[in-house]
Amino acid sequence: MLFEQIAANKRKTVFIILGFFIFVLMVGAAIGIIVWNNYLNGLILAAVIGAFYILIMVMSSSSVVMAMNHAKEVTSKEQAPVLWDTVESMAMVAGIPMPKVYIVEDPSPNAFATGISPEKGAVAVTRGLLNKLERYELEGVIAHEISHIRNYDIRLSTIAIALVAVIAILSDIAMRMIFWGSITGGRNSRKSDNNNGGGAQAIIYIVALIFVILAPIIATAIQFALSRNREYLADASAVELTRNPDGLIQALQKISGDSKKMEEVSASSESIYFSSPLKSKKNKPGLFDSHPPISSRIERLENM
Protein backbone atom coordinates (compact mmCIF):
# COMPACT_ATOMS: atom_id res chain seq x y z
CA MET A 1 0.00 0.00 0.00
CA LEU A 2 2.83 2.42 0.91
CA PHE A 3 4.77 1.94 -2.32
CA GLU A 4 1.55 2.06 -4.35
CA GLN A 5 0.76 5.48 -2.85
CA ILE A 6 4.26 6.74 -3.62
CA ALA A 7 4.07 5.50 -7.23
CA ALA A 8 0.58 6.95 -7.73
CA ASN A 9 1.61 10.35 -6.37
CA LYS A 10 4.68 10.44 -8.61
CA ARG A 11 2.57 9.63 -11.70
CA LYS A 12 0.09 12.34 -10.80
CA THR A 13 2.92 14.85 -10.38
CA VAL A 14 4.30 14.05 -13.84
CA PHE A 15 0.86 14.65 -15.39
CA ILE A 16 0.42 17.94 -13.49
CA ILE A 17 3.86 19.27 -14.53
CA LEU A 18 3.34 18.27 -18.18
CA GLY A 19 -0.09 19.88 -18.10
CA PHE A 20 1.43 23.02 -16.60
CA PHE A 21 4.00 23.39 -19.40
CA ILE A 22 1.33 22.77 -22.05
CA PHE A 23 -0.88 25.36 -20.36
CA VAL A 24 1.91 27.97 -20.49
CA LEU A 25 2.36 27.34 -24.21
CA MET A 26 -1.40 27.61 -24.72
CA VAL A 27 -1.36 31.00 -22.99
CA GLY A 28 1.51 32.06 -25.23
CA ALA A 29 -0.40 30.95 -28.33
CA ALA A 30 -3.49 32.85 -27.19
CA ILE A 31 -1.44 36.01 -26.64
CA GLY A 32 0.12 35.57 -30.09
CA ILE A 33 -3.37 35.50 -31.61
CA ILE A 34 -4.46 38.58 -29.65
CA VAL A 35 -1.35 40.70 -30.21
CA TRP A 36 0.09 39.58 -33.56
CA ASN A 37 -2.69 37.46 -35.05
CA ASN A 38 -0.02 34.70 -35.14
CA TYR A 39 0.13 32.02 -32.45
CA LEU A 40 3.78 31.10 -33.22
CA ASN A 41 5.03 34.50 -32.04
CA GLY A 42 3.23 33.95 -28.76
CA LEU A 43 4.69 30.46 -28.35
CA ILE A 44 8.21 31.83 -28.80
CA LEU A 45 7.55 34.67 -26.32
CA ALA A 46 6.19 32.23 -23.71
CA ALA A 47 9.11 29.83 -24.16
CA VAL A 48 11.76 32.58 -23.87
CA ILE A 49 10.23 34.32 -20.84
CA GLY A 50 9.48 30.96 -19.21
CA ALA A 51 13.01 29.61 -19.60
CA PHE A 52 14.57 32.87 -18.37
CA TYR A 53 12.32 33.19 -15.32
CA ILE A 54 12.70 29.53 -14.30
CA LEU A 55 16.49 29.88 -14.52
CA ILE A 56 16.44 32.93 -12.24
CA MET A 57 14.14 31.22 -9.71
CA VAL A 58 16.12 27.98 -9.62
CA MET A 59 19.41 29.84 -9.13
CA SER A 60 18.01 31.83 -6.19
CA SER A 61 19.69 30.84 -2.95
CA SER A 62 17.76 28.98 -0.24
CA SER A 63 19.28 31.51 2.16
CA VAL A 64 16.81 34.04 0.74
CA VAL A 65 13.90 31.82 1.78
CA MET A 66 15.39 31.37 5.25
CA ALA A 67 15.87 35.13 5.64
CA MET A 68 12.30 35.84 4.53
CA ASN A 69 11.03 33.49 7.24
CA HIS A 70 13.40 34.77 9.96
CA ALA A 71 15.17 31.41 10.32
CA LYS A 72 18.50 31.29 12.14
CA GLU A 73 21.06 28.61 11.32
CA VAL A 74 22.07 26.02 13.89
CA THR A 75 25.82 25.73 13.33
CA SER A 76 26.68 23.09 15.93
CA LYS A 77 25.07 20.07 17.57
CA GLU A 78 25.36 21.68 21.02
CA GLN A 79 22.84 24.39 20.05
CA ALA A 80 20.00 21.90 19.44
CA PRO A 81 21.21 18.32 20.01
CA VAL A 82 17.87 16.51 19.54
CA LEU A 83 17.05 18.40 16.35
CA TRP A 84 20.58 17.98 14.98
CA ASP A 85 20.62 14.22 15.67
CA THR A 86 17.17 13.76 14.14
CA VAL A 87 18.05 15.61 10.93
CA GLU A 88 21.36 13.77 10.68
CA SER A 89 19.82 10.31 11.17
CA MET A 90 16.90 10.89 8.79
CA ALA A 91 19.26 12.22 6.10
CA MET A 92 21.43 9.14 6.53
CA VAL A 93 18.43 6.82 6.13
CA ALA A 94 17.30 8.80 3.05
CA GLY A 95 20.78 8.55 1.54
CA ILE A 96 21.32 12.30 1.11
CA PRO A 97 23.88 14.73 2.57
CA MET A 98 22.86 16.24 5.90
CA PRO A 99 20.92 19.45 5.19
CA LYS A 100 21.68 22.68 6.99
CA VAL A 101 19.55 23.11 10.10
CA TYR A 102 17.59 26.25 11.04
CA ILE A 103 15.23 27.33 13.83
CA VAL A 104 12.43 29.88 13.50
CA GLU A 105 11.64 31.57 16.82
CA ASP A 106 7.87 31.18 16.62
CA PRO A 107 5.54 29.47 19.15
CA SER A 108 3.38 27.85 16.47
CA PRO A 109 4.51 24.28 15.63
CA ASN A 110 5.64 24.02 12.02
CA ALA A 111 8.57 23.21 9.73
CA PHE A 112 9.73 23.56 6.13
CA ALA A 113 12.54 22.54 3.81
CA THR A 114 14.28 24.31 0.96
CA GLY A 115 17.08 23.72 -1.54
CA ILE A 116 16.80 22.76 -5.21
CA SER A 117 18.88 19.61 -4.75
CA PRO A 118 19.88 17.28 -1.88
CA GLU A 119 23.36 18.85 -1.90
CA LYS A 120 21.85 22.28 -1.22
CA GLY A 121 19.12 21.21 1.19
CA ALA A 122 18.10 22.96 4.40
CA VAL A 123 15.49 22.15 7.05
CA ALA A 124 13.89 24.67 9.40
CA VAL A 125 11.61 24.04 12.38
CA THR A 126 9.85 26.46 14.68
CA ARG A 127 10.57 26.69 18.37
CA GLY A 128 6.96 25.70 18.95
CA LEU A 129 7.51 22.40 17.12
CA LEU A 130 10.55 21.55 19.23
CA ASN A 131 8.68 22.33 22.44
CA LYS A 132 5.49 20.48 21.53
CA LEU A 133 6.59 17.19 19.95
CA GLU A 134 8.10 14.04 21.38
CA ARG A 135 11.22 12.78 19.64
CA TYR A 136 9.43 10.06 17.63
CA GLU A 137 6.91 12.67 16.45
CA LEU A 138 9.71 15.05 15.53
CA GLU A 139 11.29 12.23 13.51
CA GLY A 140 8.08 11.96 11.48
CA VAL A 141 8.07 15.69 10.67
CA ILE A 142 11.79 15.78 9.84
CA ALA A 143 11.41 12.66 7.66
CA HIS A 144 8.60 14.48 5.81
CA GLU A 145 10.85 17.49 5.17
CA ILE A 146 13.83 15.31 4.23
CA SER A 147 11.53 13.56 1.74
CA HIS A 148 10.74 16.91 0.12
CA ILE A 149 14.48 17.40 -0.43
CA ARG A 150 15.10 13.84 -1.63
CA ASN A 151 12.10 13.96 -3.99
CA TYR A 152 13.23 17.32 -5.48
CA ASP A 153 9.93 18.87 -4.40
CA ILE A 154 11.52 22.27 -3.81
CA ARG A 155 12.77 22.33 -7.40
CA LEU A 156 9.31 21.32 -8.64
CA SER A 157 7.54 23.94 -6.55
CA THR A 158 10.05 26.58 -7.67
CA ILE A 159 9.34 25.76 -11.31
CA ALA A 160 5.59 25.83 -10.64
CA ILE A 161 5.82 29.24 -8.95
CA ALA A 162 7.93 30.51 -11.87
CA LEU A 163 5.38 29.25 -14.40
CA VAL A 164 2.54 30.98 -12.54
CA ALA A 165 4.58 34.19 -12.55
CA VAL A 166 5.31 33.80 -16.28
CA ILE A 167 1.61 33.38 -17.05
CA ALA A 168 0.80 36.47 -14.98
CA ILE A 169 3.51 38.44 -16.83
CA LEU A 170 2.27 37.30 -20.25
CA SER A 171 -1.33 38.10 -19.34
CA ASP A 172 -0.32 41.54 -18.08
CA ILE A 173 1.63 42.25 -21.29
CA ALA A 174 -1.40 41.38 -23.41
CA MET A 175 -3.79 43.46 -21.31
CA ARG A 176 -1.51 46.50 -21.35
CA MET A 177 -1.01 46.32 -25.10
CA ILE A 178 -4.75 46.12 -25.64
CA PHE A 179 -5.50 48.90 -23.13
CA TRP A 180 -2.98 51.35 -24.52
CA GLY A 181 -3.87 50.68 -28.13
CA SER A 182 -0.43 49.31 -28.96
CA ILE A 183 -1.92 46.75 -31.31
CA THR A 184 -4.02 49.09 -33.44
CA GLY A 185 -2.31 47.85 -36.57
CA GLY A 186 -3.10 44.27 -35.61
CA ARG A 187 -6.74 45.18 -35.09
CA ASN A 188 -6.93 46.77 -38.52
CA SER A 189 -5.46 43.69 -40.19
CA ARG A 190 -7.83 41.54 -38.13
CA LYS A 191 -10.80 43.56 -39.42
CA SER A 192 -9.59 42.88 -42.95
CA ASP A 193 -9.31 39.17 -42.16
CA ASN A 194 -12.82 39.22 -40.70
CA ASN A 195 -14.20 40.72 -43.93
CA ASN A 196 -12.59 37.87 -45.87
CA GLY A 197 -13.26 35.05 -43.41
CA GLY A 198 -16.53 35.99 -41.75
CA GLY A 199 -16.79 36.03 -37.95
CA ALA A 200 -14.53 33.02 -37.31
CA GLN A 201 -11.47 35.20 -36.70
CA ALA A 202 -13.39 37.42 -34.28
CA ILE A 203 -14.60 34.38 -32.32
CA ILE A 204 -11.05 33.02 -32.05
CA TYR A 205 -9.86 36.42 -30.85
CA ILE A 206 -12.58 36.66 -28.17
CA VAL A 207 -11.95 33.10 -26.94
CA ALA A 208 -8.20 33.79 -26.77
CA LEU A 209 -8.82 37.01 -24.84
CA ILE A 210 -11.07 35.28 -22.27
CA PHE A 211 -8.51 32.49 -21.91
CA VAL A 212 -5.68 34.97 -21.24
CA ILE A 213 -7.78 36.80 -18.62
CA LEU A 214 -8.59 33.55 -16.78
CA ALA A 215 -5.13 31.99 -17.22
CA PRO A 216 -3.50 33.37 -14.02
CA ILE A 217 -6.37 32.00 -11.91
CA ILE A 218 -6.21 28.58 -13.57
CA ALA A 219 -2.41 28.50 -13.24
CA THR A 220 -2.60 29.24 -9.53
CA ALA A 221 -5.09 26.39 -9.07
CA ILE A 222 -2.71 24.01 -10.90
CA GLN A 223 0.20 25.15 -8.71
CA PHE A 224 -1.76 24.42 -5.53
CA ALA A 225 -2.90 21.04 -6.87
CA LEU A 226 0.77 20.15 -7.36
CA SER A 227 1.59 21.38 -3.85
CA ARG A 228 -1.17 19.25 -2.26
CA ASN A 229 -0.04 16.17 -4.17
CA ARG A 230 3.57 16.60 -3.08
CA GLU A 231 2.46 16.84 0.56
CA TYR A 232 0.77 13.43 0.29
CA LEU A 233 3.91 12.03 -1.37
CA ALA A 234 6.16 13.45 1.36
CA ASP A 235 3.93 11.89 4.04
CA ALA A 236 4.17 8.48 2.37
CA SER A 237 7.92 8.87 1.85
CA ALA A 238 8.36 9.84 5.52
CA VAL A 239 6.75 6.56 6.60
CA GLU A 240 9.10 4.76 4.20
CA LEU A 241 12.03 6.32 6.11
CA THR A 242 10.79 5.94 9.69
CA ARG A 243 8.69 2.77 9.32
CA ASN A 244 6.46 4.38 11.94
CA PRO A 245 3.31 6.11 10.65
CA ASP A 246 2.15 6.72 14.24
CA GLY A 247 4.87 9.30 14.81
CA LEU A 248 3.72 11.40 11.86
CA ILE A 249 0.05 10.86 12.73
CA GLN A 250 0.59 12.04 16.31
CA ALA A 251 2.55 15.07 15.08
CA LEU A 252 -0.23 16.02 12.66
CA GLN A 253 -2.85 15.66 15.41
CA LYS A 254 -0.88 17.87 17.80
CA ILE A 255 -0.28 20.51 15.13
CA SER A 256 -3.95 20.41 14.12
CA GLY A 257 -4.98 20.91 17.76
CA ASP A 258 -2.73 23.95 18.15
CA SER A 259 -4.68 27.14 17.42
CA LYS A 260 -1.71 29.51 17.23
CA LYS A 261 -1.03 30.98 13.80
CA MET A 262 2.53 31.80 12.88
CA GLU A 263 3.33 35.39 13.81
CA GLU A 264 5.36 36.26 10.71
CA VAL A 265 4.87 34.28 7.51
CA SER A 266 6.01 35.29 4.05
CA ALA A 267 2.99 34.92 1.75
CA SER A 268 5.19 33.44 -0.97
CA SER A 269 6.43 30.77 1.47
CA GLU A 270 3.08 29.46 2.69
CA SER A 271 3.10 26.39 0.46
CA ILE A 272 6.51 25.13 1.67
CA TYR A 273 5.46 24.64 5.30
CA PHE A 274 4.68 21.24 6.85
CA SER A 275 1.13 22.38 7.56
CA SER A 276 -0.66 25.56 6.55
CA PRO A 277 0.62 28.36 8.82
CA LEU A 278 -2.81 29.98 8.42
CA LYS A 279 -4.40 27.08 10.38
CA SER A 280 -7.21 26.16 7.98
CA LYS A 281 -9.76 23.81 9.57
CA LYS A 282 -11.43 22.66 6.34
CA ASN A 283 -12.06 18.95 5.85
CA LYS A 284 -12.00 19.12 2.05
CA PRO A 285 -9.26 20.75 -0.05
CA GLY A 286 -10.20 23.86 -2.00
CA LEU A 287 -8.81 24.77 -5.41
CA PHE A 288 -6.58 27.42 -3.86
CA ASP A 289 -5.42 25.53 -0.77
CA SER A 290 -1.67 24.88 -0.68
CA HIS A 291 -2.08 21.93 1.70
CA PRO A 292 -4.54 19.04 1.89
CA PRO A 293 -6.64 18.95 5.09
CA ILE A 294 -4.77 17.41 8.01
CA SER A 295 -7.69 15.02 8.55
CA SER A 296 -7.21 13.72 4.99
CA ARG A 297 -3.46 13.29 5.52
CA ILE A 298 -4.06 11.36 8.74
CA GLU A 299 -6.64 9.13 7.05
CA ARG A 300 -4.17 8.19 4.31
CA LEU A 301 -1.47 7.44 6.86
CA GLU A 302 -3.82 5.24 8.87
CA ASN A 303 -4.65 3.24 5.73
CA MET A 304 -1.01 2.39 5.00
Swiss-Prot record:
Cofactor: Zn(2+)
Active site: 145
Membrane topology value: Multi-pass membrane protein
GO biological process: proteolysis
Bilayer-spanning residue ranges: 14-34, 39-59, 159-179, 202-222
Molecular functions per Gene Ontology: metalloendopeptidase activity; zinc ion binding
Cofactor-binding details, from the entry: Binds 1 zinc ion per subunit.
UniProtKB keywords: Cell membrane, Hydrolase, Membrane, Metal-binding, Metalloprotease, Protease, Transmembrane, Transmembrane helix, Zinc
Protein's UniProt keywords contain Nucleotidyltransferase: no
Compartments it resides in: Cell membrane
GO CC, alphabetical: plasma membrane
Keyword rRNA processing recorded: no
Entries under Pfam families matching the protein: Peptidase_M48
EC id: 3.4.24.-
Matching InterPro entries: HtpX_protease, Pept_M48_protease_HtpX, Peptidase_M48
Record-listed Zn(2+) binding positions: 144, 148, 231
NCBIfam families recorded: PRK04897.1 (NF003425)
Family (UniProt): Belongs to the peptidase M48B family.
Protein name listed in UniProt: Protease HtpX homolog
UniProt source species: Listeria monocytogenes serotype 4a (strain HCC23)
